[in-house]
């Protein structure tokens, strides 16, 4: 929120979109930004043209929109910063539709920034984005905030939190574990040891990860 506010105040005529899995969550984030704005020194504040639960417009021409993440959320607009909150909780098909709709707008601006923030929720589209970012396969920069970096949180706090919730919930919400956030037949530890790789070839829906080796025996398992 602080970065978005700084960007809007110190840059003229910029458009910022705050999108979340629910419209109420996006409006809550905008509300925090508005509260931060009210606490800025008077010399730093711009004149306000629009101030409501869904949008903010400053005298320097900068605008901030709050809405739910959908394919039509920012269609037709031009944005300098798009902030996506709790992106892992967006259904896969909506996330795919969103980027298919918005990416032309994102790629048209040389300085357009996309900030994706989320708690892990299993091995879904957000996991794929994060894993690819770690391996340098996309242009995102992975940044993890561990619970121990928050002032006042220590081992005692950890033990109390686990006692009041569960170890699995703690791993997901605070340890940023992608596995364990969904119930699986196979243990999380085993799944975590597996590696996600891109296929070496794709052909009409057939993904090939390894070339067959001559005179080797292979076993095929099919889940129907």
Language model region names:
Residues 13-35:
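Conserved Walker A/P-loop ATP-binding site and its immediately adjacent core
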Residues 8, 15-17, 218-222:
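Conserved beta-strand elements of the Class I
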Residues 1-12:
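Walker A/P-loop NTP-binding motif
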């Amino acid at each position: 929120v602080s970065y978005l506010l700084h960007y809007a105040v110190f840059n003229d005529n910029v458009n910022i979109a705050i999108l979340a899995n629910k419209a109420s969550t996006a409006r809550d984030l905008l509300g925090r930004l508005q509260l931060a704005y009210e606490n800025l020194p008077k010399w730093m504040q711009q004149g306000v043209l629009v101030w409501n639960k869904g949008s903010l417009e400053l005298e320097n021409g900068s605008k901030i929109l709050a809405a739910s993440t959908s394919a039509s959320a920012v269609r037709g607009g031009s944005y300098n910063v798009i902030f996506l909150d709790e992106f892992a909780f967006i259904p896969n098909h909506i996330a795919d539709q969103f980027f298919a709709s918005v990416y032309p707008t994102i790629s048209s601006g040389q300085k357009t920034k996309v900030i994706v923030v989320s708690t892990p929720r299993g091995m879904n589209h957000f996991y794929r984005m994060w894993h690819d970012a770690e391996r340098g396969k996309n242009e995102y920069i992975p940044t993890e905030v561990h619970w121990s970096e928050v002032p006042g949180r220590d081992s005692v706090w950890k033990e109390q939190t686990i006692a009041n919730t569960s170890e699995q919930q703690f791993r997901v919400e605070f340890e940023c574990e992608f596995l364990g956030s969904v119930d699986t037949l196979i243990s999380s530890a085993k799944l975590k040891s597996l590696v996600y790789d891109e296929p070496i070839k794709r052909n009409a829906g057939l993904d090939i990860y390894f070339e067959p080796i001559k005179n080797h025996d292979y076993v095929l398992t099919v889940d129907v």
